[in-house]
Amino acid sequence: MNAPLDGLSVSSSSTGSLGSAAGAGGGGGAGLRLLSANVRQLHQALTALLSEAEREQFTHCLNAYHARRNVFDLVRTLRVLLDSPVKRRLLPMLRLVIPRSDQLLFDQYTAEGLYLPATTPYRQPAWGGPDSAGPGEVRLVSLRRAKAHEGLGFSIRGGSEHGVGIYVSLVEPGSLAEKEGLRVGDQILRVNDKSLARVTHAEAVKALKGSKKLVLSVYSAGRIPGGYVTNHIYTWVDPQGRSISPPSGLPQPHGGALRQQEGDRRSTLHLLQGGDEKKVNLVLGDGRSLGLTIRGGAEYGLGIYITGVDPGSEAEGSGLKVGDQILEVNGRSFLNILHDEAVRLLKSSRHLILTVKDVGRLPHARTTVDETKWIASSRIRETMANSAGFLGDLTTEGINKPGFYKGPAGSQVTLSSLGNQTRVLLEEQARHLLNEQEHATMAYYLDEYRGGSVSVEALVMALFKLLNTHAKFSLLSEVRGTISPQDLERFDHLVLRREIESMKARQPPGPGAGDTYSMVSYSDTGSSTGSHGTSTTVSSARNTLDLEETGEAVQGNINALPDVSVDDVRSTSQGLSSFKPLPRPPPLAQGNDLPLGQPRKLGREDLQPPSSMPSCSGTVFSAPQNRSPPAGTAPTPGTSSAQDLPSSPIYASVSPANPSSKRPLDAHLALVNQHPIGPFPRVQSPPHLKSPSAEATVAGGCLLPPSPSGHPDQTGTNQHFVMVEVHRPDSEPDVNEVRALPQTRTASTLSQLSDSGQTLSEDSGVDAGEAEASAPGRGRQSVSTKSRSSKELPRNERPTDGANKPPGLLEPTSTLVRVKKSAATLGIAIEGGANTRQPLPRIVTIQRGGSAHNCGQLKVGHVILEVNGLTLRGKEHREAARIIAEAFKTKDRDYIDFLVTEFNVML
């Protein structure tokens, strides 16, 4: 029963693998015979339902499960493999043969849908979704046009590029489609014996427009796809860094709903029985540190977990360990607490009474998933009735002036009198995708635009900043319905250009990439564009759609679910060569946020951070004078989303590792498309402030460069940060990868962060008193007082023209700093590079334990001019990071020479 599985044939491997599972979970005697019968039943079903290749994949999936015992990965893989209702009959059979200890998790994941959507070109909805029509529910609808250009009176939505079928999203009152019984929420399965199961939106339009007589096979699904909702899925590891199933009962955040009632959160966190909770009484003496590293917070939909315990600390002495969840501190619940608030409470008292639970696992990384949100057709009809109020009076076209509006979450183009429905649908979508602050901000700018105080360009740019995720961006399709007719063309041009730029940024360069983004006008389809807010320009005189399409390949990369009015209309091509980029206006307001995922040290030697650490600022369009948005509704400042960046930023966090230390989590740092989940500060005893002069005093006569002056860095919205993590070739930790630094967000918008390929490492190992400037007024920095033996050789820079020198800048001077390779890592983080507003790399973090920290000469704010004599002028961000990394790795010399200058000198 426990024989090796890899060498089994396909026909026998399923039985062998399942038999191994049965042996792992069963007892003896009759138990084994019962499980063997279950195995035989499953094996017969596998042979009947799956092809040979699919059985081989199924076997490989089971082998991976046996090796790692990760139920979450098992269900996620089966979600892709078992892609039809018939194949999913294997799930209850499989449950009977897996170990009993894993059956509860298996039931939870298959019942609650906690798995990624399939990555196949066509994916069925969730298990038993509306695409799986039951017997007897399919009906035929026959439609025949009396005239060549007569419309059928309904609109469709969906397509295989969106992972859903083709659905009827609108039926015109009094139209032929309504008379024949077509209803909103019907899924069109076939058109004249042609299946629409796996066709794109454009192909469905061609099929519906290709004949005067249509015989439609439809299934009453009762709902239509309504755009995307952002969900977050976490991967978990045990204290040794091995992948493990998530804790059962952990609530999964859905969309922006991160906060729950605390009583509900407590009742649903049945990770262990109540008796497994324990109280820990900690009294911190003078000079003693708490010695904890924590992770999580309510802004991430998580509790507070202990990810590190310092040897010899009070935490270790009291029995706290990695993998514990902190439930309560001094009577304050930690089940629904923000990360920073938890840090403040832990460091503000010298007597702590903690309630902890031995969960035995840690959240490791987060994946952001955009899932299809479904809208019930009954709700759509109610919305139309409430917004219009007189549906029965609109059976003729001449009663009211026709208007064109966009359907929910798609690029729907429909001739209708129900133009006032647009705002209602926009509000409906915004409630699902935006929090209250963002919702109020969007409403404010729309009101300002309608009042004439804000131009369409300013409105669009403000919305680009506000709708900063893949899911939120789909709201632009509804916003278009509120745009004045004279501004529609400009609105479409701006949105289309942004979409093309974002898609080019998301798709890696390769042969034929240019064809993907070519502007193609589908004059024969009548389909609207597949982009988010890009809609067609409609002439109501002849029902003519002037189509501007970006190709089917474009539709596969976006949120919007295009709708199109299935009318026989003519199309004229419009070239896009006249599109001109709108220059980004200068920021009118800037905000400072705490960068997520930056470890902050909570030591006893806290100083105000130097202002050389920039806050990532975002462009915010302010209203004219005497007009102000409602309180608390300013758009969330932040760096541009991943779509705006030409390339992903680099951030390789540095752990203060010794050559002999073990880092079991390194094997998990290659996860793709995952976000860090938050700052991981080290919590120490309450701070005892020392004077800055004493902190800056360096023993041994080792001079430190003067502190940077307090001039904030006016960085752009696309500021890149880089931390170079380089290990010596002869040292054990060989982590030379780079990882993306999470962009600046507030807690209220974290749930909508889109995935930009970021990977979470293990707490990044920043010690608790280390210099880490996160944001003005929020960061902490302490200056090392240890004496360092390093060389500081001043060297004159070439003369610079002093004319027009901004006030307050020092004369350009440079210093040669020699950094000995005294540790396994260099331990610096840099930002900037060519083609950015910081043309030369600047040090933003120096971590304890690294060679740079041991040197004592480099400091935060230094601008790096040269590395080992190689100039960094003209070097882009990634190239500069690569040069520094290679200089540290080379065995030719045991030091690195950095030519640095102060931040506030002219470069």
Curated annotation (Swiss-Prot):
> Is Ribosomal protein found in the keyword set?
no
Ranges of biased composition (kind: Low complexity): 521-540, 628-642
Q: Which InterPro entries match?
A: PDZ, PDZ_sf, USH2_Complex_Protein, Whirlin_HN-like_dom1, Whirlin_HN-like_dom2
A single GO molecular-function term is: identical protein binding
Provide GO CC annotations from the record.
actin filament; ciliary basal body; cilium; cytoplasm; growth cone; periciliary membrane compartment; photoreceptor connecting cilium; photoreceptor inner segment
**Region entry Disordered, spans:** 243-264, 502-540, 565-663, 684-717, 742-815
Gene3D superfamilies referenced in this protein's UniProt entry, alphabetically = 1.20.1160.20, 2.30.42.10
Question: Which keywords does the record carry?
Answer: Cell projection, Cytoplasm, Deafness, Hearing, Non-syndromic deafness, Phosphoprotein, Repeat, Retinitis pigmentosa, Synapse, Usher syndrome
Give all residue intervals belonging to the PDZ domain: 140-223, 279-361, 816-899
Compositionally skewed regions (Polar residues) per UniProt: 609-626, 743-762
Where it sits in the cell: the answer is: Cytoplasm; Cell projection, Stereocilium; Cell projection, Growth cone; Photoreceptor inner segment
User: Basic and acidic residues bias located where?
Assistant: 789-800
Which positions bear Phosphoserine?
685
Q: Give any single GO term for biological process.
A: sensory perception of sound
Assembly with partners or alone: Forms homooligomers. Interacts (via C-terminal PDZ domain) with MYO15A; this interaction is necessary for localization of WHRN to stereocilia tips. Interacts (via C-terminal PDZ domain) with MPP1/p55. Interacts with LRRC4C/NGL1. Interacts with MYO7A. Interacts with RPGR. Interacts with EPS8. Interacts with CASK. Interacts with CIB2. Component of USH2 complex, composed of ADGRV1, PDZD7, USH2A and WHRN. Interacts (via PDZ domains) with PDZD7; the interaction is direct. Interacts (via N-terminal PDZ domain) with USH2A (via cytoplasmic region). Interacts with ADGRV1/MASS1 (via cytoplasmic region).
Q: What does this protein do?
A: Involved in hearing and vision as member of the USH2 complex. Necessary for elongation and maintenance of inner and outer hair cell stereocilia in the organ of Corti in the inner ear. Involved in the maintenance of the hair bundle ankle region, which connects stereocilia in cochlear hair cells of the inner ear. In retina photoreceptors, required for the maintenance of periciliary membrane complex that seems to play a role in regulating intracellular protein transport.
Associated condition reads: Deafness, autosomal recessive, 31: A form of non-syndromic sensorineural hearing loss. Sensorineural deafness results from damage to the neural receptors of the inner ear, the nerve pathways to the brain, or the area of the brain that receives sound information.
Q: What is this protein called?
A: Whirlin
Q: What is the lineage of its organism?
A: Eukaryota, Metazoa, Chordata, Craniata, Vertebrata
